[in-house]
C-alpha cells in the first residue's frame, strides 16, 4: 500500500496533465466555432473514450497497480473531464445489470447538473 503522500503525488501529476490537456484543446478548437465550445466537447468525449479503455483494461488486469489508476483515472481523466467518471459509473451499473441504479444515476447527474448550473446563473444574476 502506498502512503497518502504518494497517492497525492500520483493524483496531482495526472491532474496537472489533464488540466493542461483540456486547456490546450480549448485553445486549439474553441476558435474554430465561436458560438460552440468544441474544446470542452472534445475533452468530454475523449475523456469518456479513454476511461472506457482504462476500465476495460483494469477489469481484465485487476492486478494493475493502484498508482496507475490514481494517475490516469483519478488524476488525468478527473481533471480532463468529470464527465468520464460519471459515464464510467453509469456503464458499470448497466454492465452489472443494475438497470434502475444506472438510470437513476444518469438521470440524477444530468438533471442535477442542469439544475445547479441554472441555480448558479440565477444566483449570479440576482447578486449583480
UniProtKB/Swiss-Prot annotation:
The record's annotation in PANTHER family points to: FLUORIDE EXPORT PROTEIN 1-RELATED
Which keywords label this protein? Cell inner membrane, Cell membrane, Ion channel, Ion transport, Membrane, Metal-binding, Sodium, Transmembrane, Transmembrane helix, Transport
Give the reactions, separated by semicolons, that this protein catalyses: fluoride(in) = fluoride(out)
- Family per similarity comment: Belongs to the fluoride channel Fluc/FEX (TC 1.A.43) family.
Q: Which GO terms describe its biological process?
A: cellular detoxification of fluoride
Q: Name one GO cellular component term.
A: plasma membrane
Matching InterPro entries: FluC
Q: Which GO terms describe its molecular function?
A: fluoride channel activity; metal ion binding
Report activity regulation: Na(+) is not transported, but it plays an essential structural role and its presence is essential for fluoride channel function.
Q: What does this protein do?
A: Fluoride-specific ion channel. Important for reducing fluoride concentration in the cell, thus reducing its toxicity.
> Can you name this protein?
Fluoride-specific ion channel FluC
For the keyword Mitochondrion, the answer is no
Where do transmembrane segments lie in this chain?
A: 8-28, 38-58, 71-91, 103-123
Q: Which residues form a coiled coil?
A: none
Q: Where does Na(+) bind?
A: 78, 81
Q: Where in the cell is it found?
A: Cell inner membrane
Bilayer topology reads: Multi-pass membrane protein
Amino acid at each position: 500500500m502506498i502512503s497518502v503522500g504518494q497517492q497525492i503525488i500520483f493524483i496531482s501529476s495526472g491532474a496537472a496533465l489533464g488540466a493542461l490537456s483540456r486547456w490546450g484543446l480549448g485553445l486549439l478548437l474553441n476558435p474554430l466555432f465561436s458560438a460552440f465550445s468544441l474544446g470542452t466537447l472534445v475533452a468530454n468525449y475523449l475523456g469518456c473514450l479513454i476511461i472506457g479503455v482504462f476500465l476495460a483494461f483494469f477489469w481484465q488486469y485487476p492486478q494493475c497497480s493502484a498508482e496507475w489508476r490514481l494517475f490516469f483515472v483519478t488524476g488525468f481523466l478527473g481533471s480532463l473531464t468529470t464527465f468520464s467518471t460519471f459515464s464510467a459509473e453509469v456503464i458499470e451499473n448497466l454492465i452489472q445489470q443494475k438497470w434502475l441504479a444506472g438510470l437513476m444515476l444518469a438521470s440524477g447527474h444530468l438533471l442535477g447538473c442542469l439544475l445547479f448550473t441554472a441555480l448558479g446563473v440565477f444566483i449570479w444574476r440576482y447578486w449583480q
